[in-house]
Amino acid sequence: MAKLTVFTPTYNRRYILPKAYEALCRQTSRDFIWLIVDDGSDDGTGEMVQSWIEEARIPIQYHFQQNGGKMRAHNAGVSLCPTELFTCIDSDDYLVDDGVESILEEWESLKEKEHLAGIVAYRGRDPHHTMFGETFPCSGSASVSELYRKGFFGETTLVYRTDILSRYPFPVFEDEKFIPEAVAFDLIDRQYAMHIFTKVLTICEYRGDGLTRSVDKLRENNPKGWLLYYQQRIQDSSASVLRYKYVAHAVCFCWKLKRNPFGEIPASRAEIMAAFPGAFLLRLAGKL
């Protein structure tokens, strides 16, 4: 059985998926499966993937579901994953040619793994350069949130143990289709560290129809998910300017949902009241 699942959630990205497919066909190790969860595409994605399955160049598992958003697709992917390791490669990203081999060799080289949830590595603009020239601020192991607290500002490739991911599914709300990834990953960070691997594993190509280009719209349409994100961030932060920002954002989403901030936000009454001016400014700026 393969050791790694390369998971790609997709929705009407037929035009870009061939790049990810060709990159997987170039892998120096074939010890993986490509799991595609199609979140309701109507652009012929399914027919194209079926043709690749018939080519039999790489093992592909395809699952179609009604459109429910990336987080539901991710939960489905984890539930379908048959391998020890799981990495999510978005449809506008692709693995470097030795990505699978590097992941498996690095993981197998680790002697103590019980405290590890997986591997954190770089995303880059090419196989030799990170997105903005950034480097990890420490070595060995650390939680992902710890890396960012210590000054890391770049993009990461995350490889998780499937058994751990399955215990931390993304919460879903019936009338929403998005929730920040950190809602699940922050919970994992509370219990586990990640092995730090200083190699570019995925090449990132942001596109105009991707989620990262529509953050304001995502915030407007998914207030419950964003409120949960800020609630968790407040729980994990101490007194700081950053904590104040989290509280201000949480106040905004409470107003949006017509909820009482004092009953929803895990902060003192004084902190919440102090964040009201910041919340008003966020609303004036169109950030809810």
Predicted regions span which residues?
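Conserved donor NDP-sugar-binding/catalytic core segment of glycosyltransferases
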Residues: 98-133
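Short, well-formed alpha-helical segments that are part of the catalytic scaffolds
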Residues: 12-26
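Short aromatic/hydrophobic "clamp" motif used to bind/position activated sugar donors
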Residues: 86
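Short beta-strand/loop segment that forms part of the nucleotide-sugar
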Residues: 32-40, 61-66, 90-91
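Glycine-rich, basic loop-to-helix element that forms the pyrophosphate-binding segment
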Residues: 65-81
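Catalytic core of nucleotide-sugar-dependent glycosyltransferases
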Residues: 202-207, 214-240
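Conserved nucleotide-sugar donor-binding catalytic segment
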Residues: 125, 131-213
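A conserved acidic beta->alpha catalytic loop
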Residues: 23, 38-48, 90
